[in-house]
């Protein structure tokens, strides 16, 4: 479990990026921080692996304050996926994925074998192993980023807008694959996005973040959609948007789901 206990972060120039924030990420669950730009999501995420240290308050992993841990070892024990992929451009795919296992002491052949297995895990062909990142599509690069983060079998995965830079169709399939992967791997995932639909698709629990990391609401996707705590959340989630107000229509004996404007979006299965 990851626990944020009254955490504040003040950068050098003044107003707090994050002010007195407390929440937990239960083990084996996916918690998604969603909020507008500059609300402090990345700051919160980076406090888990000590890329940022809190000005006050504590971040605990399984009851241990992360500031008592060696930052380098801590970072090697936590998977981290960034929007840009963060792959080393002059290393091949397999080398990129093998980095952390190597740093953790695996022999070169073992680390390579592990990296190839990770390619299978994230649904990439082993033929891509010797390519360089620039020779991959955006979606493939993000899969490699996920493979690299998982390569040392960390308990915790931090994901900062990992699918933000790919087109909507690839993004959907990456989200779907992450959910499938999570079903079997059961990692503790803290995921940051500004896209509420991505949060609804991925989260066991969503935390809607307002300015300065203030938590506007925490709940399951269903709770957030059906019982927004206040006007800010309702507006952010877009509870009144036509695609959130689904209706049923009958089309020659088949129940068709339409949005509020009557546009068909699917059929109902019972
Ligand atoms: N290294 C830094 N030095 C000074 N201010 C910073 C630094 N990093 C972030 N900030 C400020 O802290 C606030 C929160 O930034 P943060 O990146 O955590 O927000 P975010 O919610 O992740 O935003 P985005 O969705 O745009 O990535 C912003 O006002 C930002 O300008």
Where are these regions (language model features)?
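Catalytic Walker B motif of ABC-type/P-loop ATPase nucleotide-binding domains
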Residues: 157-161
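Conserved ABC ATPase signature
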Residues: 132-136, 140-142
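Hydrophobic anchor residue at the start of the ABC signature
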Residues: 146
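ABC ATPase NBD coupling module
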Residues: 65-79, 103, 108-109
